[in-house]
């Protein structure tokens, strides 16, 4: 589990390698990730955008930006959480993801809530110990 807090918005990520959607012989690897966004602040906030940075094992960076998440722009009152699951395909057996969600408070303040850096590991990853 990976977690971070920005301005009392806690973002937690769980990842899972999905072998039935992966084929090492075809350099096709797939992970599911579940994100939970918890509003621990005293203000209602709305998630209006996302910015993902996805890096594969070769260091190739892909950035994905867009409105909302999974077709929604959830509004979170104080104490509420929103959870969703999505997926990430790569052509390498491991990688990392990070990014941010654009949040707007009920007062109109806009800020970026950090998504923690999390690893995408598979049984095909070469483990290196320093």
Curated annotation (Swiss-Prot):
Recorded coiled-coil stretches: none
Organism: Beijerinckia indica subsp. indica (strain ATCC 9039 / DSM 1715 / NCIMB 8712)
Origin: domain of life: Bacteria
Domain ApaG: residue ranges: 3-127
Pfam families tied to this protein: DUF525 (PF04379)
Source organism phylogeny: Bacteria, Pseudomonadati, Pseudomonadota, Alphaproteobacteria, Hyphomicrobiales
GO biological process annotation, one example: error-free translesion synthesis
Protein's name in the database: Protein ApaG
